[in-house]
Amino acid sequence: GLYGFFDHLLESHEKLIIDNCASGGRRIDFEMLRRSLLLWRSDLCWDPVAQQSATYGLSFWLPLHGVGSISLDPYHFRSGMGSNFTLALDYYDDPSIWNSAVQLLAEYTEVKDIFSGDFYPLTDYSTSQKSWIAWQFDRPDLGVGVIQAFRRQENNSNLRKFKLQGLQSDIQYEVFNFDTGLQLKACGY
């Protein structure tokens, strides 16, 4: 029924783009992906670990997917970043919330196009609160990449090294840390 309905809509409206709200992941299948874009992959937008897990798992297969955040906490916000992003805030009682929103949305805008690039996991998949989870998105066509590394709530390690993909030893790379504002240049290894 649903596939036929979408087929009818697409045949009747040549330029139509259908946004697939994935129904908690139940509508992420090849037939649905043929007919629609997965712009809302799950309603688990309040759980950073669920967001991270979805990004890790889907990015192997889908260049365009996302959800967003319901929080301006940087950890939570960044956990929902992807090739598509929606920010849902309750600003009714506190219009000053937009100051933080503008800052985080500027950060997202700077890296958003990279999320449709090549995906490289930098850790094993895990939902454990004691682990790190990290990945790299790379856009060789644009000469840019982004690394997201999340130290989960019960992890006591302040430092973790990751072997990045696609670096060349004779090229100097610019690295920027959104948390500290630190910018440095380093050669690949």
Identify the function of each model-found stretch.
Residues 187-189:
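Positively charged interface segments
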Residues 1:
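Active-site groove signature of glycoside hydrolases
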